[in-house]
Amino acid sequence: VSLPVSKRVQRVKPSPTVALTGRVAQLKAEGKDIIGLGAGEPDFDTPTHIADVGVEAIRKGHTRYTPVEGTAELKDAIIAKFKRENGLDYGRKQILASSGAKQTIFNLILAVIDPGHEAVIPAPYWVSYPDMVLLADGVPITPYAGADQGYKITPAQLEAAITPKTRLFILNSPSNPTGAAYTRAELRALGQVLMKHPQIVICTDDMYEHIYWADEPFVSLASVCPELYDRVVTTNGVSKAYAMTGWRLGYCGGPIELVTAMATIQGQSTSNPSSISQKAAVAALNGDQSCVREMNKHFKQRHDFIVAGLNKLPGVSCLKGAGTFYAFANIEKAMSIVGVKDDNAF
């Protein structure tokens, strides 16, 4: 007898990234020599000075519940980071730490999307965004920007995607999967559109802030458009920059009423993020940042090597990215050469 599951779940596809990662793990367990290119995960170990603090936290008994939204110590480290690196001022009540930035964003989606509400998500996008909107009974709207636009939507595209039902705009820059990053001028232009639509909450996913090598310094929307400060939830985490994917620690800064709502949702799901991970995250955010710069240097070298190699393949083209550790190749001509109809078959 098959047991019924909700229509909500039936609308959502299992994460293809998780599925591919699981398949790679299975093949490795079978003794196959395979390289996994699925999950967005640094291959470096967590820097020793951070890992040591995590181990010390266990030994000193920092293994109990903390406040749902994170410890005061971690909040202060996040506040200092936002001020130091992004020019953003937040108080403790504006900060939420979660079990990964994925949870942070899901909390926000659940906090602002009612059934039938729309969320604008520029495509190409991280595969989880639309499904999280569907789980909230919302409708993902995905304006597409191709290689001819550098995988970045225009203000006109954003304006055209907005309706009276729009409640959320999600912007990931630098982008998973394209590596594209919006310039200060481009962010300002998108911000000018959003200023005309006060019902829209903006989520900026800045997870790849420190895996970045464009000539112009990284900037976040809330700092470029201070007029939108009261509507922007700036999300980030320690997973990518500090090679801490398994520690599961994300965070955000934003308007008190939204952050409070997100904390309420989190309090009824996971409660606080790991107390051990919080201690390690404090060490990451407050400590020596040379490890971040060193990893970024290697990611840039690998990026240049892979992109150059892809562009030598028949039927393949690949733009250079401004950051992240992804290469987003166009394989349309290659698919014609080998006689397949879509990228999954390829």
Residue ranges, per PLM feature:
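PLP-dependent class I/II
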Residues: 1-5, 13-23, 27-34, 41-45, ...
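A glycine-/small-polar-enriched, mobile loop at the entrance of the PLP active site in fold-type I
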Residues: 38-43, 56-74
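Substrate/cofactor-recognition hotspot
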Residues: 9
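Conserved N-terminal alpha-helix of the aminotransferase class I/II PLP-enzyme fold
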Residues: 65-98
